[in-house]
Curated annotation (Swiss-Prot):
This is Probable cell-surface antigen I/II. One of its GO terms (cellular component) is extracellular region. The keyword Oxidoreductase does not apply. Keywords: Cell wall, Peptidoglycan-anchor, Repeat, Secreted, Signal. The modification Pentaglycyl murein peptidoglycan amidated threonine is found at residue 1280.
Length: 1310
């Protein structure tokens, strides 16, 4: 397809014809714009009709999607920034022409270059700058030409003077050379004669020296030969003597060494004998002392053994009884779910001694620790004499001179004994410090233990190995972790990688490997000893947990701490603050009941604790803290992405937080064994030493010969120094004559310049605030300002100044408002093409042409209109044409309305969709589910505001207000306005929003009706409306920040719905800036509860024979069959109450004390198990009987009802055994109560005839009952009284429970 060239059309100008024709010719195109006034579209007198449009927004007014842009608008925007033509500018050049003329007269070669084009500039300012540049260049060219001309004249005069000077200088040089050459010749002749005389004298002396030297050398050689002969004889004799002496010495030293060795062996043997004798003596004395001590201890233990055994047995008996009680209470708050006695007593060791060793870490000086506390983030508390360990910036510990070889304790000790710490307040706390990196360890040994026992035996030593978990994600650049190891092992460790800044996605974990030792320094082999894991806090940004542990986790009932994926922490709820994230109590004291649980002496400290059973000699557990978002998905309540300090204080001890845990304090004694007396030793005898060897006599060494001294050699004569011949004078150099100056060439040029004035389009709201690339509400007034830059100085006269603006689709143009906002222009509007044209008036043109030598500021017109579509983008630019010679298209501006996903200018923009969901009391969504009468629906309404973030609507638009309408079904639901809660997306309480309730639209005030009418909303009946009290404050707080609001509006299902059953629906609307949007519709169904009553003679649920309305003989045993209402599957909330209340006529019927309850349908429990229809459920019920009033209540146990899955149906039937004791007609009705709502059954009626008086009553024969075919055992009725029954066993005493709300029901009297 060939692309058509887009052009502009102007009269008479070739430039204009290529740029602007399509815009001014747009009036020839017919495009229909079906816009209507905004106020007209909002009025409605019918029921709310939510249009489904291409916008994707459920709008109740102005629902139409934005139409396609006009061809003119698309063409104009595609050419944004294009220009054609320009305005020429001239600059004077008189001085340059004069300079060129004078240079030519002076003989300079003058050349005129081609003209230079200075280009086309965009603004008057740029044009003025270019003109200045051209003027300056013309001036510079003239100056350069004049300078060249003057220089050339000067150079010619200087050349002539220099030629005369050089000629005179060359003549003087020639005369001086001839004079110097004559003097040189005379000096050479004198030097040659003196050198010849010196040479003859030297040669005579040299001959005499050579003869004397020969004689001296011959005498010295003879003396040297004689000396060498004597020296040889001396050396031979010396060698012989030295060898003889050495041999004698070696023989003597060997004898001495052998003797010393023999004596050393004897001495060593004697020393060993002495030691063995001493050791034997010491061992005997030690054994004797030990025997005496053991004998005394044996006698003492033997006397104490019976008492210790008695105390041990008594304690074990108490523990056994306590464990029985704990087994019964194990499901109660604060009790161990696996009851056990605490065999490890390990609660406190304030006097323990601590030693630390590390192979790869760094032990720290206490002075360095003190200095670190006194600075940075811990300084404020330090100045208050408080050591706040979690505030310490550990960078203060990372110093070159911080290391020490042994542990140095620090804390509120010594000169800080009056200080406090966040670990023990005023209690003395001290610790040793070490720096470790990931994977590095420190070993801590605790001795001098006074209070620690296992199974009643004293623990003497504990060894811990603390290792920084290599998977810790703390962000300290140095990789260091500070461990403060407390001297009391029960206080544990404070670990920190805190560098003064909180961290996101961080963690710190320490592995603890530990072994306990007995008094014999042997490792203790634990057998299911309990170790406490307590104070495991979980906030919305942090989770403290234990992991990678030996042993088995034991949960405490009611505690927030549980085990998940091998980790111990608060798995389901937060436990920081009551009511947040499911927390039952607040961890710190705040005056509320149960607050302050995070303290070892709090009665509910078990809420943040658990226990681990450990066995064996060596155990380990890893503890630490981690950002919540690294454990669970990010959530505004349970896991927020805020920073935390990467540190933790944890302790491992035996202080189990569960209640009533018995401790084993008595050791199981063993019968003492009498010690054996030691045997006295036999001692060895020492051996004598050998005598020393005799020393040898040595030979004297010979005397060495003396050499004869050499005669000295004569001195050699010195050769004389000869006088050098002088250098002859240099040949003269004559200076050349200078070259005449060259004739210079100068160039000059002229310039060309043109201007293209720029344009700028701005988009404003009704408050004149720039809204380009931003967001404004639908129906907002949007203004387009068409601005042109200054016209330049030196321009031609302006004869026409025209601006053409093709407006965007969906923009409702206001012609009169535009004229008022655009003085100085004639305004015309073409509705077919949605184009507005502005032409400068004659007065405006006269202003532009008043002084053409100066630049002039232009005026601009303003387009006024409204945006009428959801999720729409309004783009716009315009065209300026000046004098049919210059044309330019402006920039494109755009503004968007909310309701448009994927908006590149406003990332938060998305569909405007208020939502409504129905939840039960546990927060489970129950949309579409069956709900029971009397239950509470917690409707959660979302006021969708996030798409308005960074909105720039004007004040008048904001004042239209913000409303939320809840159109609920009053025929089915009872509004609980007292329980309504409004929170923002961050969970904060919303203020400044009022709520009103109206029984109908007609009952609402006119102001409310107007708001709803303009928004196109008509509630079906009763409704509640939420409104922002101050629209401006509401807008500033929530709307422009894009913060959604959540309204929770509880409503109770009316009890009469259970009598009739049926479905009901619920819908809501939000109104923002006068624009309405509908939520989804929520539908629920209420089942009809229809209990039934029969009279039967058997206990078989399959037997449908009903004797209602028939005759029952006197003294007959029969059953009232109470069939409960059916609860459909997939219901919304747990069952907690399902009762049968039968107000029988005690004058004619007597309850035998027997009843039976069966499942009427298959029942699925939460654990997935299924109770088949017909199964005996009696064990899950209790009964209460009032024989005087004739009332019986059978109740299902609440824990059983709550174990039934909400996805399962539920129905039960009860058989109540009666005996007819009187004649007459008796009526009976029972009440089935389901979750506090009572439903009456049908009335049964039976008649018993009067027995003949003459007859002796026969002994009644019991009715034969069929067994339950679905049960493997015979069906028997449990007793609730003491009435005899020959065929049904006694099943125990049943607890009596009150009848909830049904005590006033009366039976029918005969």
């Amino acid at each position: 397809m060939k692309k058509r060239k887009e052009v502009f059309g102007f009269r008479k100008s070739k430039v204009a014809k290529t740029l602007c024709g399509a815009v001014l010719g747009a009036a020839l195109l017919a495009m229909v714009d079906q816009q209507v006034a905004a106020e007209e579209t909002t009025k409605s007198n019918s029921t709310t009709n939510v249009a489904v449009t291409a916008t994707g927004n459920p709008a109740t007014n102005l629902p139409e999607a934005q139409g396609s842009a006009s061809k003119e608008a698309e063409q104009s925007q595609n050419q944004a920034g294009e220009t054609n033509g320009s305005i020429p500018v001239e600059v004077p050049k008189t001085d340059l022409d004069q300079a060129a003329k004078e240079a030519k007269s002076a003989g300079v070669n003058v050349v005129q270059d081609a003209d230079v084009n200075k280009g086309t500039v965009k603004t008057a300012g740029e044009a003025a700058q270019k003109e200045t540049e051209i003027k300056e260049d013309y001036t510079k060219q003239a100056e350069d030409i004049k300078k060249t001309t003057d220089q050339y004249k000067s150079d010619v005069a200087a050349h002539e003077a220099e030629v005369a000077k050089i000629k005179a200088k060359n003549q003087a040089t020639k005369e001086q050379y001839e004079k110097d050459m004559a003097a040189h010749k005379a000096e050479v002749e004198r030097i040659n004669a003196a050198n010849a005389a010196s040479k003859a004298a030297y040669e005579t002396k040299l001959a005499q020296y050579q003869a004397e030297l020969k004689r001296v050398q011959e005498a010295n050689a003879t003396n040297e030969a004689n000396y060498q002969a004597k020296l040889t004889a001396y050396k031979t004799e010396l060698a012989r003597v030295q060898k003889a002496n050495a041999d004698a010495k070696a023989a003597y030293e060997a004898a001495v060494a052998a003797n010393n060795a023999a004596n050393a062996a004897l001495t060593a043997e004697n020393t060993a004998i002495k030691k063995r004798n001493a050791d034997a003596k010491a061992d005997y004395e030690a054994k004797l002392a030990k025997y005496q001590a053991d004998l005394a201890k044996y006698q003492k233990d033997l006397a104490e053994y019976p008492q210790k055994l008695k105390e041990y047995n008594e304690e074990q008996a108490k523990i056994k009884e306590a464990l029985k009680k704990l087994e019964q209470d194990k499901n109660k708050d604060g009790h161990l779910t696996e009851p056990s006695a605490q065999s490890l007593v390990y609660d406190s060791e304030p006097d323990a001694k601590l030693s630390l060793t590390t192979e790869d870490g760094t032990l720290l000086k206490s002075s360095v620790v003190d200095e670190a506390f006194s600075k940075s983030t811990s300084k404020a508390k330090y100045d208050q004499k408080i050591l706040q360990l979690d505030d310490l910036d550990i960078r203060g510990l990372e110093k070159a001179d911080s290391a020490t070889s042994t542990v140095e304790l620090y804390g509120n000790i010594g000169n800080k004994s009056t200080w406090t710490t966040n670990v023990g307040n005023n209690t003395e706390v001290k610790w040793g410090s070490v720096l470790l990196k990931r994977g590095q360890s420190v070993t801590a040994t605790y001795t001098n233990l006074q209070k620690t026992y296992y199974n009643g035996k004293k623990v003497s030593k504990i060894v811990y190995k603390y290792t920084v978990d290599k998977d810790s994600k703390f962000q300290n650049p140095s990789g260091n972790v500070w461990l403060g190891v407390f001297s009391d092992p029960t206080l544990g460790v404070f670990a920190s990688a805190y560098t003064g800044q909180v961290e996101k996605d961080t963690s710190i974990f320490i592995k603890n490997e530990f072994t306990f030792y007995d008094e014999n320094d042997q490792p203790i082999n634990f057998d299911n000893a309990l170790l406490s894991v307590a104070s495991l806090n979980r906030e919305n940004n942090s989770i403290e947990m234990a992991k990678d542990y030996t042993g088995k986790f034991v949960r405490i009932s009611g505690s927030s701490i549980d085990e998940k994926d091998g980790k111990i922490y608060a798995t389901k709820t937060l436990n920081f603050k009551k009511g947040q994230g499911g927390s039952r109590w607040t961890m710190y004291p705040n005056g509320q009941e149960g607050s302050g649980w995070d303290s070892s002496d709090a009665p509910n400290s078990w809420y943040g604790a658990g226990a681990v059973k450990i066995s064996g000699q060596h155990n380990s557990i890893t503890l630490g803290a981690i950002s919540a978002t690294l454990v669970v998905p990010s959530d505004s309540v349970m896991a927020v992405e805020t920073g935390k300090k990467p540190n933790i204080w944890y302790s491992l001890n035996g202080k189990i937080r569960a209640v009533n845990v018995p401790k084993i304090t008595k050791e199981n004694p063993t019968p003492p064994v009498e010690p054996t007396a030691p045997q006295a030793p036999t001692y060895e005898v020492e051996k004598p030493l050998n005598p020393a060897p005799v020393a040898p006599n040595y030979e004297k060494e010979p005397t060495p010969p003396t050499p004869t001294p050499d005669q000295p050699e004569p001195n050699k004569p010195v050769e004389p120094t000869y006088e050098a011949i002088p250098t002859p004078p240099t040949d003269p150099v004559y200076q050349n004559l200078p070259t005449p100056p060259a004739v210079p060439t100068v160039h000059f040029r002229y310039y060309k310049l043109a201007v293209q004035p720029q344009v700028n389009k701005e988009i404003k709201n009704n408050n004149d605030v720039d809204i380009d690339k931003t967001l404004v509400a639908k129906q907002s007034v949007v203004k387009f300002q068409l601005k042109t830059a200054d016209l330049p100085a030196g321009r031609a006269k302006t004869t026409s100044f025209v601006l053409v603006d093709p407006l965007p689709s969906g923009y409702q143009f206001n012609l009169e408002a535009t004229k008022a906002a655009s003085p100085g222009f004639d305004v015309s509007y073409d509705k077919a093409t949605n184009t507005v044209t502005f032409k400068a008036t004659a007065a405006t043109l006269a202003t532009f042409n008043a002084d053409l030598t100066k630049s002039v500021a232009t005026i601009y017109p303003t387009v006024v209109g409204q945006v009428l579509n959801d999720g729409a983008t309004y783009k716009n630019n315009f065209t300026l044409t000046v004098n049919d010679a210059y044309g330019i298209k402006s920039n494109v501006v755009r503004v968007t309305t909310p309701g448009k996903p994927n908006d590149p200018d406003n990332p938060n923009n998305n569909y405007i969709k208020p939502t409504k969901v129905n939840k039960n009391e546990n927060g489970v969504v129950i949309d579409g589910k069956t709900v029971l009468a009397g239950s509470t629906n917690y409707y959660e309404l979302t006021w969708d505001l996030d798409q308005y973030k960074n909105d720039r609507s004007s004040a008048d638009t904001i004042q239209k207000g913000f409303y939320y309408v809840d159109d609920y079904p009053e025929e089915a639901l009872e509004l609980r306005q007292d329980l309504v809660k409004i929170t923002d997306a961050n969970g904060n309480k919303v203020t400044g929003v009022s709520v009103d309730h109206y029984t109908s639209l007609e009952a609402a005030p006119q102001e409310v009706r107007d708001v709803l009418s303009k928004a196109g909303i008509r509630p079906k009946g009763a409704f509640q409306i939420f409104r922002a009290d101050n629209p401006r404050e509401f807008y500033d707080t929530y709307v422009k920040n894009g913060i959604d609001l959540k309204i929770v509006s509880p409503m109770v299902v009316k009890k009469q719905m259970g009598q009739t059953g049926g479905s009901y629906e619920n819908q809501a609307y939000q109104i923002d800036f006068g624009n309405g949007y509908a939520s989804n519709i929520v539908i629920n169904n209420v089942p009809k509860i229809n209990p039934k009553k029969d009279v039967t003679l058997t206990l078989d649920p399959a037997d449908t024979n009903n004797v209602d309305g028939q005759t029952i003989p006197l003294n007959t045993v029969f059953n009232y069959r109470l069939i409960g209402g059916i609860i459909p599957a997939d219901h919304s909330e747990e069952l907690f109450e399902y009762n049968f209340y039968d107000d029988y006529d005690q004058t004619g019927d007597r309850y035998t004390g027997q009843y039976k309850v069966f499942a009427k349908v298959d029942i699925t429990l939460k654990d997935g198990s299924v109770i088949k229809s017909g199964t005996d459920l009696t064990q899950h019920t209790t009964a209460e009987v009032d024989a005087t009033k004739g009332a019986l209540t059978i109740k299902f146990k609440e824990d059983f009802l709550r174990s039934v899955s909400i996805d399962s149906a539920f129905q039960a039937e009860s058989y109540i055994q009666m005996k007819r004791i009187a004649a007459g007609t008796f009526e009976n009705t029972y009440v089935n109560t389901v979750n506090k709502v009572a439903y009456a059954s049908n009335t049964v009626r039976t008649t018993t005839p009067q027995a003949p008086r003459s007859e002796v009553p026969k002994r009644p024969t019991p009715v034969s009952y069929l067994t339950n075919k679905l049960s493997s055992a015979p069906a028997t009725l449990p007793q609730t009284g003491t009435t005899d029954s020959s065929y049904m066993p006694y099943l125990g005493v049943i607890a009596l429970l009150s009848v909830l709300g049904l005590g006033q029901l009366k039976r029918n009297e005969k």
